[in-house]
Amino acid sequence: MGRKHYSSKKNRSKKGEFVNWDLIERKNENFEKYYRLQKLVTEDDFILLKQKLTEQLPTTFRITASIPHATQVRDYFIEHYYPLIENARTEDAKIPLPVSLPWYPDGMAFMLDISKEVIRKSPHLKALQEFLVLETEAGDINRQESVSMVPPLLLNVESHHKVLDMCAAPGSKTAQLLEALHKPTKKEDITTLLPSGIVIANDSDNKRAHMLVHQIKRLNSPNVLIVNHDASFLPNFHLSSPDGKKFLKFDRILADVPCSGDGTFRKNIALWNEWSLKTALGLHATQIKILMRGLQLLEKGGRLVYSTCSLNPIENEAVVSAVLNATRGSVRLVDVSSELPQLKRSQGVDNWVVCDSDLNIYPSFDTLPKELYEKMPPTLWPLPKKELAELNIQNCLRIYPHFQNTGGFFVAVLEKYENLTSSMKTAVDDNKVFLREQKLPSEQASKKRKQDTQETSSDSKLAEVKPKGKNGGNRFHELDPFVYIKEDDQALEKIYKKFGIDEAIIKKNQFFVRNVNGVPTKAIYISNDLFRNVIENNRNRVKFVHGGLKIFVRQDFGSLSREIAEKNGTCVFRVQSDGANLASHFIAESCLFHTTLSDLFILLDHEAVTIDDFPEDSLFRKEYNHLDLGSTLLHVDLAKEESVIKKQVYIPLWKSVRICNVLLSNSEKRTLKLQIEGPQSSIHKHNT
């Protein structure tokens, strides 16, 4: 029997109805019956697996690998928060200390064997909760289920790679891909912050694609582009090159496909009531299409990771083997048993039972009733064991919840060593032909078969999306299109002059705005050359949602300062906090104002300051009257100060005739205080 828990907590079911998760019995007879038929694990393991699925999921997070102070955040968490947790208790018991995930690189991920609800509600853990919230907002940590961290790690992304995340929302894996793209090899520099590679993150659902923006913006990357398409029909990305137009092929692709999610019982409690084999059966063909499309878009020599949060072979090995069988001679499964060596895993299985949604068993497609043909394609059934062995199906990874206290997950790492040929078609396509033959007269069916055999899945004839906009306009009707600023634009000229930007480091053609005129009226974004190439060659074929990094923002003067500013031709654009760190690497030293921690505290504690707010011996007071009207970038070297986190801080500063202020949100101020003073920070505790 599944355990019952009782409280007033409520959540939504798939239908959007409120349900009390704690009143749901952790049991589903059909789920148990189906997986006993599969015999994926031994009976003893199945008992452990079933029990683990009824238990609460631990809280896990990882430290952002691309920040230069990542090891400091790790050590800071251990030093300051372990003692707080060690002395904390819930109503029932002592709270266990966090543990570092043994398989995650450099000890940068942690597991707390308590639920997020306990952390949120326990007064003893208030400091921990605020650390998790503030550091997540700052982009220094990412709260993510541990097994979800595995697929991006196995992609081995490097800074020059062209990366595609086919089904990206909610974005935790996309964030990992970006971290890898930006990860410094030695020290942070302009090539680390603005590398040559790109991450294109796609989601088919418009709302989820926009939710993805919030997750990704925390990382302040100019190298990410979010698009909104059905992953199985992703359009080709065109590029211009010296030798003419060409298609963008990706070095790394993540296909974390839609699935039944039956590895997520521990966090999705409503699934105990809702689980049905019908979901997996309905998704199988879509999963094959997405994987096949991913391989078409993959560069020769590139790596693709296919993953699901399902335990079901018909969503996992059946999908992978169908595509491998169709692409023999071009794609292979990679043996990653030596990668992440402390991650406990099982091999892919070579035998499974195929049932209909009522759990009636069908040994082969030939035994299937005619009325189930459309719902159950031949690819559901396992290939002969010899063929599966030739495909190295054992190289797939199965991660079971009872192995290391996680959710359930499946991962397959594929490598494309030759381009796909025109004859490579999946059995799903063949099944469609078969179905039509059952419905059409013989002559008509013969013609249709000939037509289908002429269709292609080859790299040379990838699926095209034809522009349909009127007069060459954007057929997606973007409200805020990506338009690059003309290099002779007056506002851009003023920005370059104001901040002493060296065009040898940052070219003028890297800046764009989000309006149809291409005129910088509000925000200015920055990107790399590849990003621009993608944007300008795909306006009518790709639906762009978000991308680049907001680097400059227009800041209008008040009435008292406006006249002086206009008379002096003062630049009205200032550095945006999102891009302050990147800007510090290409603006002139004269545009940086170096100050002390004591001065910084005064600026953080006030909405606005005057010269009289600083003591007589203050460095800021001495230099105050020499500061230019408008924007300056404030710099504090915390490595030389009494600060918990020793890092370089760059903050936009705005000065008018009467006052001066730092342009940070309240949460940004609180996070900075927390990093300087630790959990005892007064601003952290009192939420000013």
Swiss-Prot record:
GO molecular function: mRNA (cytidine-5-)-methyltransferase activity; tRNA (cytidine-5-)-methyltransferase activity; tRNA binding
Cellular localisation: Nucleus; Cytoplasm
Binding site for S-adenosyl-L-methionine: C167, A168, A169, P170, G171, S172, K173, D203, D230, D256
Signal peptide location: none
Disulfide bond residue pairs: none
Consequence of gene loss (knockout): Cells lacking both trm4a and trm4b show a mild resistance to calcium chloride.
Key word Phosphoprotein present: yes
Reactions performed catalytically: cytidine(48) in tRNA precursor + S-adenosyl-L-methionine = 5-methylcytidine(48) in tRNA precursor + S-adenosyl-L-homocysteine + H(+); cytidine(34) in tRNA precursor + S-adenosyl-L-methionine = 5-methylcytidine(34) in tRNA precursor + S-adenosyl-L-homocysteine + H(+); cytidine(60) in tRNA(Asp) + S-adenosyl-L-methionine = 5-methylcytidine(60) in tRNA(Asp) + S-adenosyl-L-homocysteine + H(+); cytidine(61) in tRNA(Asp) + S-adenosyl-L-methionine = 5-methylcytidine(61) in tRNA(Asp) + S-adenosyl-L-homocysteine + H(+)
Function: tRNA cytosine C(5)-methyltransferase that methylates cytosine to 5-methylcytosine (m5C) in tRNAs at position 34 and 48. Trm4a and trm4b methylate different sets of tRNAs. Also methylates cytosine to m5C at positions (60, 61 and 62) in tRNA(Asp).
Name of the protein in its database record: Multisite-specific tRNA:(cytosine-C(5))-methyltransferase trm4a
UniProt organism field: Schizosaccharomyces pombe (strain 972 / ATCC 24843)
